[in-house]
Amino acid sequence: MVGLRFDNQTRSCHSNKTMFEDRIIQDIIDAWQHDQDHLERGRRQRSIPDFDSVRVLIETAFLASLNREEDRSITFSLALLQRDEIDEEQRTSGRSQLVMNFEIAEPLSVESILKLAPAVDSEMTSLAVERRDDGAQYQIWGALNYSPTTKRFNEIPGVIPELIYTRPDVLTISSRQPGSLLVSRANNLIGRFVGGEFIRATPRPFASGSMGSFLIRAVHTHSLYNRSGNEYWLIYRDALDYLLSEVASRSHGATIVLIPQRSLQHYEHERRFTYEYRFSRELGLRDLFIRLIEGPPGSMSGQIALRKLIEERLQLLAQLSAIDGALLLTDELDLISFGVTLNAPVWEGTVLIGPDAFGGGGDIFAHTKLGTRHNSTIDFIGKCPDCVAFVVSEDGPIRGIVQRDSSTLLCWPDCTESMFV
């Protein structure tokens, strides 16, 4: 990384020197192109973001993300869209936002982002950025407002389509952690910029051709699967996805381990973990799943109430991950213990990037450069072949880890389900 020169008035980047290597910016553009070109993803064909614009947004957003407001990390979202193209963009994409123009545009700079960030919720608003007419500078011309992304347990059925606003299908750079950026379009995550490197998102990590095959194998042993089949799998998958997203938002790094109930006593005997905190009763997720599958009595309101209850129980589970130590669950998502210490010898085998159901994966995953949390989890999975683990990094990615065979582990570098941001 090389130095930058700042203008004292705008704190904009004016140096012809750059922060990040060209290959990183190009990798972001290539990831966008690859995602758009893939037939199975059904993306709308649109122009590829230009190199200079990607660099300006990434570098300005990165610098802004390093700042704090009253000792808290700032969050914000930048969407690249020319003001005079908004009507055409909304018409062709079928996605609309509540567009609010500034009377006077603000220069795109670290200073302007820091001033505006507290006034907007990055889950519901992106600051609209365009290249000025002179082609040399960029400016923030307004705000694009939309409804936050919903999932099974917090969506409200029966909405009025014409009154719903959605994320724009344009290059969007979001910051939720210092030095960590999300690169997305609409609700689809293209990748994360973390530690000066770009990590492509894993498309559909819970698909059967990806990490999902290991989860499905466990789910097939559950009594609820025998009772309700694929409907149970879909609810289970969405519950796990929601749990991981809540853990990511509530903790500064965490480990979640799923252990088959039938193997728990064996691993206890082998002292593969040291319990710290245990409760004497369950949260009752399984019973709520049954009621949701079999249908609540009454109308739609009963369905919404059940989903809300499941959401609250998952939030309770997620909060337990905020203390030091791993969160241990059965593979049916029942709580075993939290604040747990994992015990296993150092893994001597190979760690590969897991398949992504679209032909990717298979490269060596360089885990040795990661911290203790990742490596202790890798060691644990190396000795507990029927377990599944997730490591939520402080800088954003959620990594999934399983054992493929006695000499090989698979790791998915970022397994945020559906690439939703």
Where in this protein do the model-derived segments appear?
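Divalent-cation
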Residues: 3-421
